[in-house]
């Protein structure tokens, strides 16, 4: 009878209203101290699914009221969330689940990908211009869009996760990204330049460009290529500072001598924390930028770059090193503390190395050299050889094999 179902409905609603205050109390004034058994579960899941917060998220906020717990926050791993819910249930907890798995497909309205739409976009820890910069993205770079909160939380082809202002990227669907990836492009080969509204350097500029930028190739007019931006804007770029991508790849060299020559071309470019472009670089950003100009994608930070390629122990006379090896510096291991990588450069031969420290410069490990760097010699740790391992390791690839560029 209708009256029976009405009473049942009222009973269910009454139960729900009883439950809501319980979680409201947990949310507002509840105990945020995590019980040891839950902390142990959370730590084990974080180590398994998101050991490096730069490339994976497991940010969970817990509010407890006895054996009731409210979960909030975000994670990039659906498996981690499932394991957390199962683990809490086994420990006897009643869970109100508000933990969000990224990407937020509903909030993003299906546009879970994006393309960098400015010459160099700044990626930050939090969605605010005053927040610390983490890394940068280059025009034409495909990204995964995870979340929107005024800004966009994105993941770059080296898997770095950070926030970017909405102007920095053009959000797209997977199909639109595939169309962009498959389109013929023009690659910027000069460290800096401009796109113009007409095929003339006397015309209005559309935007600046930096080395490694990619634009869609729309045609040719005299000494200019006609190009299109990810958002559809059009303009003209001089042939003297750019090249069709296919031609660029055909003439590309990935040997040590060519890469070192590119590194030398950036001499004097200022140090910029989190910089990964020809406008400014930090130490690992310098390595990433130089290699990317040769279509090599490596992890973002020095502490990540230290684990790609072949580990090389540096002999006292440096005879184990080859030009093009990455060399790492930092705190040496002691019985009390682990080794910690904080700086990286590239070995160029004859006991010299090139790196970004203040600006891009060359220094030496030899006390007899006028470029001797006693400070960095004292904190030298080891080297890695990456060039023979391109496309042989998951985190050492090219734009032809990286998953972001091949969708």
Task: List the predicted regions and their residue ranges.
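N-terminal targeting leaders
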Residues: 13-19, 26-70, 74-136, 141, ...
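SH3/SH3-like beta-barrel fold
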Residues: 140, 152-156, 164, 212, ...
